[in-house]
Regions:
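ATP-binding N-terminal substructure of ATP-dependent carboxylate-amine bond-forming enzymes
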Residues: 1-65, 72, 94
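Active-site nucleotide/adenylate-binding loops and adjacent lid/helix of ATP-dependent enzymes
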Residues: 64-118
Length: 118
């Protein structure tokens, strides 16, 4: 039985789990599934429950949850040796000020972009 949590891609059984963790009915449906389709906006709790219940889960979100956010993407690209823009990661503004206290000696020259990790 193909179980779909995707709002557009239909399966034999269709469930929506948007904005919430999987409930007992979702988990029971997963236990009966031979394959599970997940939505793009998948919570980690839904993904982990699907992986525990079924060997065939699409898509594979392992990298997404192992390397969350923008800083996670940079770390993943570095580990895999993939090209990416030069990136510096700071845990907060105090970390930046500690590492670069002199405003005349910034680590990067313009043009540059500052992003929050979310």
């Amino acid at each position: 039985m193909l179980l779909s949590f995707h709002p557009i891609l239909e399966g034999d059984v269709n469930r929506l789990c948007a904005g919430r963790d999987p409930d007992p009915e979702d988990l029971a449906a997963m236990d009966k599934a031979t394959a599970i389709l997940l939505p793009q906006g998948c919570r980690e709790s839904l993904y982990r429950a699907a992986r525990r219940a079924c060997a065939r889960v699409f898509p594979n979100y392992e990298a997404r949850f192992a390397y969350p956010g923008k800083t996670g993407q940079v770390k993943l690209f570095r580990e895999l040796g993939l090209p990416h823009p030069e990136s510096l990661i700071f845990s907060n503004i105090e970390d930046f000020n500690t590492r670069y206290p002199d405003p005349d000696k910034m680590p990067l020259a313009p043009p540059l972009m500052v992003k929050r990790d979310w």
